[in-house]
């Protein structure tokens, strides 16, 4: 059975020409055709940027609210006090607290995907850097997770906001949806992310900024995107 599945996946993968860059709409269609796993695979993008990742002024970090969401159920924790506690809860936060939430995190209970904090609570949150930082959960104003408007931050997280940052090779990896999304929805999610990354271009970056764009599903082959079809 396993051999049969492998052969089928190989046949599907052969549809993709390795040396060809596809128009975005065609690439998305191919990815959906090649995604034959028994679970709802994620659609991921890798964007190679023409930056010097060794220089801090060229590192890129940000967040995009995908118009059609990411397909993930996101659990949100909020550090807040006063009126912001009720605002966070009303917006849909799963966990809201301050010192009690910090103790919970220090004890290893980290059952959430996004952490949001108001500026005045950072005196408490700042002490959790060694726990939250390595997990990519440390609140940061650059991605809107340190904010006075906790309600909007919670709603954005719940509605499909994705966070991104360049890795040591100057590549951004991000999920833009699931295989069961409509092709048009995936296309619009991709373009929303790409437009935000374009706006974040460092002034010090030289030459071609968007060097290579690749889409793939969790178990499928990578498909290069023709940059000219997305205004890159």
Curated annotation (Swiss-Prot):
One of its GO terms (biological process) is regulation of translation. The keyword Ribosomal protein applies. Part of the 50S ribosomal subunit. This is Large ribosomal subunit protein uL1. PANTHER family: 54S RIBOSOMAL PROTEIN L1, MITOCHONDRIAL, LARGE RIBOSOMAL SUBUNIT PROTEIN UL1M. Coiled coil: none annotated. The lineage of its organism: Bacteria, Pseudomonadati, Pseudomonadota, Gammaproteobacteria, Legionellales. One of its GO terms (molecular function) is tRNA binding. Belongs to the universal ribosomal protein uL1 family. Binds directly to 23S rRNA. The L1 stalk is quite mobile in the ribosome, and is involved in E site tRNA release. GO terms for cellular component: cytosolic large ribosomal subunit. Gene3D superfamilies: 3.30.190.20, 3.40.50.790. Keywords: Repressor, Ribonucleoprotein, Ribosomal protein, RNA-binding, rRNA-binding, Translation regulation, tRNA-binding. HAMAP family: Ribosomal_uL1_B. The keyword Repressor applies. Pfam families: Ribosomal_L1.
